[in-house]
């Protein structure tokens, strides 16, 4: 059975926090693909980027995504870049899962992300990098999503409750 809900969105949108709250409300299991990768690799995502490179990480991300879509039936949170490849987009669409785009503005993301070293794609000028990522990713997120939730002014519990309403 495929995931009931797949959460997608940029860094700082609250995919992990909202996902945990949503899973509680739905009495479902929660899986975060970044956490699965970090556990499998015994390294943080930023360490994987530094030690093994982005290409390795993206390959691992696809592997974990394809596996979790096949074995997980609860709430699945994807890393911000996970839906970018054609393979990932196809798998997400074919899963039959409800996809929710958790959106956030730059102003909303900044205090959550902190634009620190733990976000490997946001090094250098993190605000400009984040905006550039969103310019590329937003059309993909929007094309995959059945629902869109702006999380700027919502707590994780409020965003999760809004998703439950959308699912009804």
Question: Predicted segment positions?
Answer:
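NTP-dependent small-molecule kinase module
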Residues: 2, 21, 25, 98, ...
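Hydrophobic anchor at the beta1->P-loop junction of P-loop NTPases
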Residues: 7
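P-loop (Walker A) phosphate-binding loop of NTP-binding proteins
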Residues: 10
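Conserved lysine of the Walker
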Residues: 15
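Hydrophobic positions on the alpha1 helix immediately C-terminal to the Walker A/P-loop
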Residues: 18
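ATP-dependent small-molecule kinase phosphotransfer cores
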Residues: 32-93, 119, 127, 131
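Short glycine-rich anion-binding loops that position phosphate/pyrophosphate groups of nucleotides
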Residues: 80-83, 105-107, 154
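A glycine- and Lys/Arg-enriched "phosphate-lid" helix/loop adjacent to the NTP-binding pocket
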Residues: 94-139
């Amino acid at each position: 059975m495929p995931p009931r809900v797949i959460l997608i969105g940029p860094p700082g949108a609250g995919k992990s926090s909202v996902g945990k709250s949503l899973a509680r409300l739905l009495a479902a299991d929660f899986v975060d693909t970044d956490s699965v990768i970090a556990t499998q690799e015994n390294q943080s995502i930023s360490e994987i980027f530094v030690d093994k490179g982005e290409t390795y990480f993206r390959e691992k991300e696809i592997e974990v995504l394809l596996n979790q879509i096949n074995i997980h039936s609860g709430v699945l949170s994807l890393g911000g870049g996970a839906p970018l490849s054609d393979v990932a987009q196809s798998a997400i669409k074919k899963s039959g899962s409800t996809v929710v785009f958790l959106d956030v503005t730059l102003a909303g993301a900044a205090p959550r992300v902190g634009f620190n070293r733990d976000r490997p794609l946001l090094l250098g000028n993190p605000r400009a990098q984040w905006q550039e990522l969103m310019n590329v990713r937003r059309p993909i997120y929007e094309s995959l999503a059945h629902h869109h939730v702006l999380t700027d002014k919502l707590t994780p519990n409020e965003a999760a409750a809004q998703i439950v309403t959308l699912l009804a």
